[in-house]
A protein has these predicted regions:
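Feature marks short, highly hydrophobic, charge-poor N-terminal signal-anchor/signal peptide-like helices
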Residues: 1-9
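Hydrophobic alpha-helical membrane-embedded segments
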Residues: 9-29, 58, 62
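A composition-driven signal for long, intrinsically disordered, charge-rich low-complexity tracts
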Residues: 18, 22, 31-35, 69, ...
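Structured domain cores in non-transmembrane regions
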Residues: 48-82
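Membrane-proximal, non-transmembrane alpha-helical segments
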Residues: 78-142
Length: 142
């Protein structure tokens, strides 16, 4: 029983540290992004790799923006571009998607912090641990 409590405390500590770190990093990068938008900060391209990694950890899906531009001779090129690949772009639609992505990441890490202290979460985790392990390892649950 003593070892179970030690393992549980270690898992709880790791999860709290991971979620708190993610939440604080989200707030930090969101402030850097807002400073960049107002012209008071450095170029945001420096932070694009860590922000992309943060969004991946928070399971934020990559938003796409439709792009139409004239290429000449009466022709138009259309494409979908990733917002995360164009973070430093100050277009209104890009900024809106970025702010929404920061809010989603903040919510994900906040939810994780709250789940750490919920007994129902841990009970559910114990009951569904085999299926979660299979999902994590990429094994089909069928």
């Amino acid at each position: 029983m003593k070892y179970f409590l030690i393992v549980f405390a270690a898992i709880l500590s790791y999860r709290v540290a991971f979620c708190l770190s993610g939440y604080l990093r989200t707030i930090y990068y969101e402030k850097k992004y807002n400073a960049y938008l107002t012209g008071k900060g450095e170029i945001f391209t420096l932070y694009s790799a860590p922000v992309r990694k943060l969004f991946k950890q928070a399971k934020v899906s990559t938003p796409l923006i439709a792009l139409c531009e004239p290429v000449g001779f009466g022709k138009i090129r259309t494409a979908n571009v990733s917002v995360f690949d164009n973070m430093a772009n100050k277009r209104q639609d890009t900024v809106g998607h970025m702010m929404n992505s920061f809010a989603q990441a903040r919510g994900y890490f906040r939810m994780g912090l709250l789940e750490c202290f919920s007994p129902l979460y841990w009970i559910q985790m114990i009951f569904f641990l085999p299926s979660k392990l299979c999902e994590f390892l990429g094994v089909s649950s069928d």
